[in-house]
Amino acid sequence: MRRKSLPVLFAALLFSAASFAKVSLEIDGLEKELKDNVDAYLSSIPESDYSTQLRFQSRLQKNIVEALNALGYYHPKIDFEVKESGEVLAVHVDAGEVTRLELVDIVITGEAENDPDFIRVISQSGLKQGEPLNHGQYDSLKSSLRNLALQKGYFNGTYIASRLEVAPELNQAFVRLHYDSGIRYQFGATSVEGSQIDENRVASLQPYKEGDPYLVSKVGEHNQNLSSTEWFSSVFVEPDLNNLDGGRELPMRVSVAPQARNKFETGLGYSTDVGPRGTFKWKKPWINSRGHSFDSSFSISEPEQYITAGYKIPLEDVLHEYYRVQYGLKKVDNRDTQSLESNLSVERHWLVDSGWHRTMFVRYLIESYEQGVLDDVGQFVLPGFTFSRTRARNSGSLITWGDKQTVTIEYGSDSFVSETNVVRVLAGTSWIRTAGENHRGVFRMGGGANFVDDFDKLPPSLRFFAGGDNNLRGYDYESISPRDSSGALAGAKYMATGSVEYQYRLAGNWWGAVFVDGGDAFDYTPRWKTGTGFGVRWVSPVGPLRLDFAWGLESDPGERFRIHFSLGPEL
């Protein structure tokens, strides 16, 4: 008796071991869309549950049938085959004939009947007579119409009929969606609670007028406008649905809380241009009920120290039109340049409809300096203007698409304070483009020109120097310019630089980069310098951290290789 039971026990143990061995699935017979949907349904099953047992096969069949039903296939044939000694469960699927839409009856009534957005959503839904049934398209359209109604102020909208009927034996499906939107509400009076700023200033940030059709995007824009002023620590804009008076005007309620009167910020940084750097910032986001503000910053590094203070006076268009008065004091001790620069400027800012930011300014510059063999004090009054535009689309803190253009022209005359007649032109452009998820291109061009009667009377801050982390990699910071009779750097009348960089995603937020930089700072004829190399980028919350290994091809032997490290925005 015992001898007979041993083989039975041994077989049972083998069967149990096979049942718990790791099993993989092979599914064939399905086209890509069907295969993808089946995979999505099966993703809820942990691989540890995979088995060749009949119970698991039944579970698997149920999920596959549900996945195929969702795309209109109600007559699938599913066969299972255990292969490779129980290590593979093969699933052979014949999806069968597809169920098609025999009737598509979609009707919008109410004030949204001729609304182009509703018409567009319906036309793009994919629900058309004769097309294969897709439950996802039906569910998506149903929720899209409801969401669109809420976004556009049809708050009383309701479905009169919403049915999807399937006759599997006929391979036919019938869609009935009848939606009554009701009336469309309009923006009514707006009330503001908690504001310390003048009522008219706050009202100017409202992107809609009383009586305009309701749009949730306008509510979001209003919220963003209020936040962008930095006057408030919290902002909440919402329709006051509890105070409807039976008409179509929807009261709006704005709740804000004042920002702190003083904000302080400290920071430590490092770049190979200036070495370790410490910063301190003090800001008063609002000074009075008219929304005036004050900001100041102090930065110290070994070659450069500066302090700035600015006072901002917003105008009727609070965010885009304002006056700014700024004073800055900067000390430089770098290579052959020692200077103490004092700048006082008055600026008028506008944003034009095309997205360009326009600034008209006049600045008063006094600079005491030693530049090579020159030792002097210069003063200039420089009126001018700047046009700039920045466009960007972000994925987190990484710019996936963007560009920036800046042009500045300023003029000084020896008939009014300035040491010599000078016209200065500065221009720059940067472009970022992304291909797919793993490829980025970064392109930069920049330059400047001094059209001057007596170049020797220009202080260092008005001359050009090239080289450094953000200019010409492979060369030291501001190490490129013509030299004077003593061999010291003298600064240049002109400068032109450019850069081409390709980046490839290595993993997650890590990117590799290869680049070529070129340019020169010169007086008459450029002698182009080239820097090339490779680097690593890490996308941090405050912008990309960049580590580059660069070779300056025209550098002196022994000085051609340089490491560049920097952190900050790419545009």
Task: Name each model-derived stretch.
Residues A21-E33, S43-T272, K281, D295-I313, ...:
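Periplasmic polypeptide-binding modules associated with outer-membrane biogenesis and secretion
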Residues Y73, K330-S339, G412-N421, L553-E554:
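Outer-membrane beta-barrel proteins
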Residues S16-S19:
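N-terminal signal peptide c-region/cleavage motif recognized by signal peptidases
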Residues M1-V8:
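Bacterial N-terminal signal peptides that target proteins for export
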Residues P526-F534, W538-S540, D548-W551:
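Strand-loop-strand
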Residues I108, G194-Q196, P314-L315, L340-S345, ...:
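Flexible, surface-exposed loop regions and adjacent strand-edge segments
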Residues D117, L215-T406, G441-F443, N470-G474, ...:
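Gram-negative/organellar outer-membrane beta-barrel architecture
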Residues E370-V373, F380-L506, V514-G518, F522-D523, ...:
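C-terminal outer-membrane beta-barrel translocator/porin domains of Gram-negative envelope proteins
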